Amino acid sequence: MRKIRKGDEVVVITGKDKGKRGTVLRVLETKLVVEGVNVAKKHQKPNPVRGVAGGIVEKTMPIDASNVAIFNPASQKADRVGFKVLEDGRKVRVFKSSGEVIGA
């Protein structure tokens, strides 16, 4: 079970985008693609066969998972993730500061 999943809201805790918040769009092995964070400009060549216009395109690049923390909406701060087994046997993610279940 991963600590950060697709759809989670995260805060960048270090690097050039420190303090920015965004939603996780994609989870890679050790990196995350976060909406609006680590945006790079790519020079794209036109491809008439695919119908792609050329030019400078802004693309969201992956950021290392260690540089982000999950956002706790109750405290409005970055938080750490822990795991807890419920009475019915399900393993769920919880916020370390408050103990409440993430995504419930």
UniProtKB/Swiss-Prot annotation:
SUPFAM superfamilies: Translation proteins SH3-like domain
Keyword Ribonucleoprotein in annotation: yes
A molecular function (GO) term: rRNA binding
Listed HAMAP family: Ribosomal_uL24_B
Chain's role: One of two assembly initiator proteins, it binds directly to the 5'-end of the 23S rRNA, where it nucleates assembly of the 50S subunit.
GO biological process, one term: translation
Keywords: Ribonucleoprotein, Ribosomal protein, RNA-binding, rRNA-binding
CDD domains (UniProt xref): KOW_RPL26 (cd06089)
SMART domains in the record: KOW
Subunit structure: Part of the 50S ribosomal subunit.
Protein name: Large ribosomal subunit protein uL24
CC per GO annotation: ribonucleoprotein complex; ribosome
Organism domain of life: Bacteria
Family to which this protein belongs: Belongs to the universal ribosomal protein uL24 family.
